[in-house]
Amino acid sequence: MGAGIAHCPLSNMYFADAAFPLREALDQDLHVGLGSDLSGGPLPSIFHAALDAVSHSRVREAGTNTHIMDQRGEANSRVSFVEAFWLATHGGGLTLDLPVGIFKPGYYFDALVIDSNTAGSQVRIYDDLDSAQDALEKIIVHTTEPAISAVWVSGKQIK
């Protein structure tokens, strides 16, 4: 049995006084799952945790001081929105050795329907302008409870 890392970016920043080297962990093929630690952050949203993972990786890469760009930051530490989404879904399943996070026979069907047309939704996706990656970024950045129109957990619709 192996080990894995449960990573809550905001909690890590608050309590470890540092940003977790996520890019390096991924490059070493470590099992990392993204989590939302309510006691360590303001929102219990996995979308918010994914946005934090991307934001923190960009801060690590760009640096936090006023030195000239090539004298600050940690090169190649960026994590993409696609990677953050993977960490929030299948990465968590791999870390916990659970069959979750991907749509595949034998895996639990856990899913959300994000509706950009519902009242209160802040998600705006334009078929003629947004690529699939653009749409994913918008979902991660802008999804709040009003945009979630349906929820399935272990194959059972609960909303």
Regions found by a protein language model. Give the residues of each.
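Generic structural "secondary-structure junction" signal
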Residues: 16-17, 40, 138-143
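C-terminal cap of metal-dependent C-N hydrolases
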Residues: 108-159
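Conserved residues at beta->alpha junctions
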Residues: 9, 37, 143
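Residue-level signal for inorganic ion chemistry
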Residues: 5, 37, 155
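His/Asp/Glu-enriched, well-ordered alpha-helical/loop segment
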Residues: 18-123
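Long hydrophobic segments that form regular secondary structure
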Residues: 1-13
